[in-house]
Protein backbone atom coordinates (compact mmCIF):
# COMPACT_ATOMS: atom_id res chain seq x y z
CA UNK A 1 0.00 0.00 0.00
CA UNK A 2 2.99 2.33 0.24
CA UNK A 3 5.08 1.31 -2.76
CA UNK A 4 3.42 3.78 -5.15
CA UNK A 5 2.27 3.26 -8.70
CA UNK A 6 5.66 2.57 -10.25
CA UNK A 7 7.14 -0.80 -11.12
CA UNK A 8 8.37 -3.03 -8.34
CA UNK A 9 12.06 -2.38 -7.71
CA UNK A 10 14.79 -4.85 -6.98
CA UNK A 11 13.39 -7.48 -4.61
CA UNK A 12 16.57 -7.23 -2.57
CA UNK A 13 15.62 -3.82 -1.20
CA UNK A 14 12.17 -4.97 -0.17
CA UNK A 15 13.62 -7.96 1.68
CA UNK A 16 16.29 -5.78 3.27
CA UNK A 17 13.64 -3.35 4.50
CA UNK A 18 11.62 -6.23 5.91
CA UNK A 19 14.67 -7.53 7.76
CA UNK A 20 15.20 -4.16 9.43
CA UNK A 21 11.50 -3.79 10.24
CA UNK A 22 11.53 -7.23 11.89
CA UNK A 23 14.49 -6.27 14.07
CA UNK A 24 13.12 -2.89 15.13
CA UNK A 25 9.53 -4.03 15.69
CA UNK A 26 10.72 -7.01 17.74
CA UNK A 27 12.79 -4.66 19.91
CA UNK A 28 9.83 -2.31 20.37
CA UNK A 29 7.36 -5.08 21.19
CA UNK A 30 9.53 -7.21 23.48
CA UNK A 31 11.76 -4.57 25.08
CA UNK A 32 9.96 -1.24 24.85
CA UNK A 33 7.45 0.16 27.37
CA UNK A 34 3.80 -0.28 26.44
CA UNK A 35 3.25 3.40 25.65
CA UNK A 36 6.02 3.28 23.02
CA UNK A 37 4.78 0.20 21.17
CA UNK A 38 3.53 2.07 18.11
CA UNK A 39 4.49 3.16 14.61
CA UNK A 40 5.83 6.49 15.86
CA UNK A 41 8.60 4.72 17.78
CA UNK A 42 9.52 2.71 14.69
CA UNK A 43 9.77 5.87 12.59
CA UNK A 44 11.85 7.66 15.24
CA UNK A 45 14.26 4.73 15.46
CA UNK A 46 14.78 4.73 11.69
CA UNK A 47 15.22 8.52 11.68
CA UNK A 48 17.97 8.22 14.28
CA UNK A 49 19.93 5.54 12.42
CA UNK A 50 22.74 7.62 10.97
CA UNK A 51 25.13 5.74 8.66
CA UNK A 52 28.55 6.99 7.53
CA UNK A 53 29.85 5.49 4.32
CA UNK A 54 33.42 6.54 5.09
CA UNK A 55 33.41 5.14 8.63
CA UNK A 56 32.19 1.55 8.92
CA UNK A 57 32.98 1.53 12.65
CA UNK A 58 30.58 4.40 13.43
CA UNK A 59 27.67 3.46 15.68
CA UNK A 60 24.38 5.31 16.01
CA UNK A 61 22.01 5.31 18.98
CA UNK A 62 20.08 2.29 17.71
CA UNK A 63 23.30 0.31 17.29
CA UNK A 64 24.10 0.89 20.96
CA UNK A 65 20.57 -0.17 21.94
CA UNK A 66 21.03 -3.49 20.14
CA UNK A 67 24.53 -3.90 21.56
CA UNK A 68 23.05 -3.67 25.03
CA UNK A 69 20.32 -6.16 24.19
CA UNK A 70 22.87 -8.54 22.66
CA UNK A 71 24.82 -8.55 25.92
CA UNK A 72 21.69 -9.39 27.91
CA UNK A 73 20.24 -11.88 25.45
CA UNK A 74 22.43 -12.74 22.44
CA UNK A 75 19.79 -15.14 21.08
CA UNK A 76 17.00 -12.54 21.12
CA UNK A 77 15.02 -12.56 17.86
CA UNK A 78 15.54 -8.80 17.41
CA UNK A 79 19.31 -9.15 17.89
CA UNK A 80 19.57 -11.95 15.35
CA UNK A 81 17.62 -9.98 12.73
CA UNK A 82 19.57 -6.79 13.36
CA UNK A 83 22.86 -8.66 12.99
CA UNK A 84 21.78 -9.72 9.50
CA UNK A 85 20.92 -6.13 8.59
CA UNK A 86 24.35 -5.00 9.84
CA UNK A 87 26.00 -7.24 7.26
CA UNK A 88 25.24 -4.47 4.76
CA UNK A 89 28.04 -2.04 3.94
CA UNK A 90 27.66 1.65 4.78
CA UNK A 91 26.42 2.60 1.32
CA UNK A 92 23.97 -0.30 1.16
CA UNK A 93 22.73 0.36 4.71
CA UNK A 94 22.11 4.00 3.83
CA UNK A 95 20.10 2.95 0.77
CA UNK A 96 18.02 0.60 2.92
CA UNK A 97 17.30 3.40 5.40
CA UNK A 98 16.34 5.78 2.59
CA UNK A 99 13.92 3.15 1.23
CA UNK A 100 12.41 2.69 4.70
CA UNK A 101 12.11 6.43 5.17
CA UNK A 102 10.37 6.87 1.83
CA UNK A 103 7.94 4.02 2.50
CA UNK A 104 7.07 5.31 5.98
CA UNK A 105 6.94 8.99 4.99
CA UNK A 106 3.17 9.31 5.66
CA UNK A 107 3.85 8.52 9.32
CA UNK A 108 5.75 11.81 9.61
CA UNK A 109 2.49 13.73 9.16
CA UNK A 110 1.53 15.24 12.52
CA UNK A 111 -2.13 14.21 12.33
CA UNK A 112 -1.22 10.62 11.51
CA UNK A 113 1.35 10.49 14.30
CA UNK A 114 -1.40 11.49 16.72
CA UNK A 115 -3.63 8.68 15.46
CA UNK A 116 -0.82 6.15 15.77
CA UNK A 117 0.33 7.22 19.23
CA UNK A 118 -2.27 5.18 21.15
CA UNK A 119 -5.05 2.62 20.67
CA UNK A 120 -8.62 3.73 21.22
CA UNK A 121 -10.36 1.35 18.81
CA UNK A 122 -9.95 -1.97 20.66
CA UNK A 123 -10.53 -3.86 17.42
CA UNK A 124 -10.14 -7.20 19.18
CA UNK A 125 -13.26 -6.53 21.27
CA UNK A 126 -15.70 -5.80 18.43
CA UNK A 127 -17.25 -9.26 18.84
CA UNK A 128 -17.66 -9.03 22.61
CA UNK A 129 -20.80 -6.90 22.50
CA UNK A 130 -22.96 -5.09 19.97
CA UNK A 131 -20.79 -2.36 18.51
CA UNK A 132 -20.81 -0.10 15.44
CA UNK A 133 -17.51 1.19 14.07
CA UNK A 134 -17.21 3.45 11.02
CA UNK A 135 -14.12 4.28 8.96
CA UNK A 136 -14.63 7.44 6.92
CA UNK A 137 -12.29 8.23 4.03
CA UNK A 138 -12.07 11.04 1.51
CA UNK A 139 -13.29 10.23 -2.00
CA UNK A 140 -10.91 12.81 -3.51
CA UNK A 141 -7.71 12.45 -1.43
CA UNK A 142 -6.20 8.99 -1.00
CA UNK A 143 -3.35 10.05 1.34
CA UNK A 144 -4.73 8.28 4.40
CA UNK A 145 -6.68 5.48 2.75
CA UNK A 146 -4.02 2.86 3.48
CA UNK A 147 -4.79 3.25 7.19
CA UNK A 148 -8.16 1.58 6.64
CA UNK A 149 -6.50 -1.42 5.01
CA UNK A 150 -4.08 -1.55 7.94
CA UNK A 151 -6.97 -1.43 10.41
CA UNK A 152 -8.91 -4.16 8.58
CA UNK A 153 -5.84 -6.40 8.45
CA UNK A 154 -5.31 -6.06 12.19
CA UNK A 155 -9.01 -6.39 12.94
CA UNK A 156 -9.42 -9.72 11.15
CA UNK A 157 -6.31 -11.18 12.79
CA UNK A 158 -7.20 -9.93 16.27
CA UNK A 159 -10.81 -11.12 16.07
CA UNK A 160 -9.78 -14.59 14.89
CA UNK A 161 -7.24 -14.85 17.71
CA UNK A 162 -9.80 -13.72 20.27
CA UNK A 163 -12.39 -16.17 18.97
CA UNK A 164 -9.90 -19.04 19.20
CA UNK A 165 -8.19 -18.14 22.47
CA UNK A 166 -11.08 -16.80 24.54
CA UNK A 167 -14.36 -18.03 23.09
CA UNK A 168 -13.60 -21.52 21.86
CA UNK A 169 -13.59 -20.64 18.18
CA UNK A 170 -16.68 -18.41 17.79
CA UNK A 171 -17.25 -14.81 18.84
CA UNK A 172 -20.29 -14.26 21.09
CA UNK A 173 -21.62 -11.52 18.77
CA UNK A 174 -21.51 -11.80 14.99
CA UNK A 175 -19.24 -9.20 13.38
CA UNK A 176 -20.50 -8.04 9.98
CA UNK A 177 -17.99 -6.05 7.93
CA UNK A 178 -19.52 -3.86 5.20
CA UNK A 179 -16.51 -2.75 3.19
CA UNK A 180 -17.64 -0.03 0.80
CA UNK A 181 -15.11 1.53 -1.58
CA UNK A 182 -12.98 -1.60 -1.20
CA UNK A 183 -10.92 -0.62 -4.23
CA UNK A 184 -9.93 2.72 -2.71
CA UNK A 185 -8.74 1.60 0.72
CA UNK A 186 -5.64 -0.33 -0.24
CA UNK A 187 -4.79 -4.02 -0.15
CA UNK A 188 -5.18 -6.29 2.86
CA UNK A 189 -2.36 -8.88 2.77
CA UNK A 190 -3.62 -12.45 2.69
CA UNK A 191 -7.26 -11.47 2.17
CA UNK A 192 -7.76 -14.60 0.06
CA UNK A 193 -6.93 -16.68 3.16
CA UNK A 194 -8.84 -14.48 5.58
CA UNK A 195 -12.15 -14.78 3.72
CA UNK A 196 -11.82 -18.57 3.80
CA UNK A 197 -11.61 -18.83 7.59
CA UNK A 198 -13.51 -15.94 9.18
CA UNK A 199 -17.00 -17.41 8.72
CA UNK A 200 -16.40 -20.09 11.34
CA UNK A 201 -15.44 -17.36 13.84
CA UNK A 202 -18.78 -15.53 13.43
CA UNK A 203 -17.34 -12.91 11.09
CA UNK A 204 -18.77 -12.05 7.69
CA UNK A 205 -17.46 -9.75 4.97
CA UNK A 206 -19.27 -7.87 2.23
CA UNK A 207 -17.06 -6.26 -0.41
CA UNK A 208 -18.35 -3.42 -2.58
CA UNK A 209 -16.69 -2.83 -5.97
CA UNK A 210 -17.69 -0.68 -8.92
CA UNK A 211 -16.39 -3.43 -11.20
CA UNK A 212 -14.80 -6.86 -10.82
CA UNK A 213 -11.68 -5.48 -12.47
CA UNK A 214 -11.01 -3.40 -9.35
CA UNK A 215 -10.61 -6.53 -7.23
CA UNK A 216 -8.35 -8.09 -9.87
CA UNK A 217 -6.21 -4.95 -10.02
CA UNK A 218 -5.57 -5.13 -6.27
CA UNK A 219 -5.29 -8.87 -5.65
CA UNK A 220 -4.22 -10.17 -9.07
CA UNK A 221 -4.50 -13.98 -9.22
CA UNK A 222 -6.03 -14.11 -5.73
CA UNK A 223 -9.12 -12.18 -6.83
CA UNK A 224 -10.79 -15.36 -8.09
CA UNK A 225 -10.19 -17.07 -4.73
CA UNK A 226 -11.63 -14.09 -2.86
CA UNK A 227 -14.76 -14.05 -4.98
CA UNK A 228 -15.05 -17.82 -4.76
CA UNK A 229 -15.35 -17.56 -0.98
CA UNK A 230 -18.31 -15.19 -1.21
CA UNK A 231 -21.71 -16.86 -0.72
CA UNK A 232 -23.39 -14.40 -3.06
CA UNK A 233 -22.34 -11.96 -5.77
CA UNK A 234 -24.84 -9.19 -6.48
CA UNK A 235 -24.53 -7.00 -9.58
CA UNK A 236 -26.35 -3.68 -9.83
CA UNK A 237 -26.55 -2.55 -13.45
CA UNK A 238 -25.80 1.05 -14.35
Residue ranges and their predicted role:
Residues 195-238:
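Conserved ATP-driven motor cores of ASCE-family P-loop NTPases powering translocation/secretion/packaging/pilus
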Residues 1-203, 218:
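P-loop NTPase motor domains
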Amino acid sequence: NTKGDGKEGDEFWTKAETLLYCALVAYIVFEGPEEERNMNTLVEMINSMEVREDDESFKNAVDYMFDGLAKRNPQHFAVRQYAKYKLASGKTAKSILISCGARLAPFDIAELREIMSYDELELDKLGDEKTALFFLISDTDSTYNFIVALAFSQMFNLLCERADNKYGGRLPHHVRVLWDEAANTGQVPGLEKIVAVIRSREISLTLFYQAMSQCKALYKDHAETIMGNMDNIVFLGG
